[in-house]
């Protein structure tokens, strides 16, 4: 498995895959990979020629008084899990790589789905999720993106975004997989 950090390298990799007619499956993560993530990578492996996994602790989905700095960053361990599960490429960009400008474009799903549950107490969270996922979908030109049903509200937000923006990606929603201890 190859690990890259730059958008330029990612685009070159994706361009080569598309030139060869390969399908691409995408698993987006914030790292700290576990069996649930591995199951998503394995599902992507079964359905695609190429599997790209992202590890990116996204600062735009953390609000004030949410501990972005304390979020675990375990790239070496994450790379081992991703490789063992069948990923071909791990894209681990820096925040500066993903958000090069202070003023930026946002993608925001509005309406009841983003105002309840997590969205009620974290009002900018889903704007950050939608923005970074749009960037990842565009950068990887993925045919399919894999998400666990554990994140039910997030998957509904992403489904609405994909539908409303006519994105050419199929969201594959997979069953929850738990560790032996139930986590």
Predicted regions and their residues:
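Nucleotidyltransferase catalytic core that binds NTPs
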Residues: 1-183
């Amino acid at each position: 498995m190859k690990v890259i950090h730059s958008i330029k390298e990612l685009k070159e990799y994706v361009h080569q895959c598309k030139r060869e007619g390969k399908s691409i499956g995408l698993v987006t993560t914030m790292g700290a990979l576990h069996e649930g993530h591995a199951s998503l990578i394995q599902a992507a492996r079964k359905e695609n020629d190429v599997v790209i996994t992202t590890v990116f602790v996204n600062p735009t989905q953390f609000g004030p008084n949410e501990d972005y700095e304390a979020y675990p960053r375990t790239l070496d361990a994450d790379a081992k899990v991703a490789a063992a599960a069948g990923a071909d490429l791990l894209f681990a960009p820096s925040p500066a790589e993903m958000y090069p400008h202070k003023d930026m474009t946002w993608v925001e799903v509005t309406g009841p789905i983003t105002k309840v549950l997590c969205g009620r107490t974290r009002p900018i969270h889903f704007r950050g999720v939608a923005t970074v996922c749009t960037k990842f979908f565009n950068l990887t030109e993925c045919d399919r993106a894999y998400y666990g049903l554990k994140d039910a509200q997030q998957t509904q937000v992403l489904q609405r975004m994909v539908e409303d923006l006519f994105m050419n990606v199929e969201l594959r929603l997979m069953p929850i997989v738990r560790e032996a201890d139930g986590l």
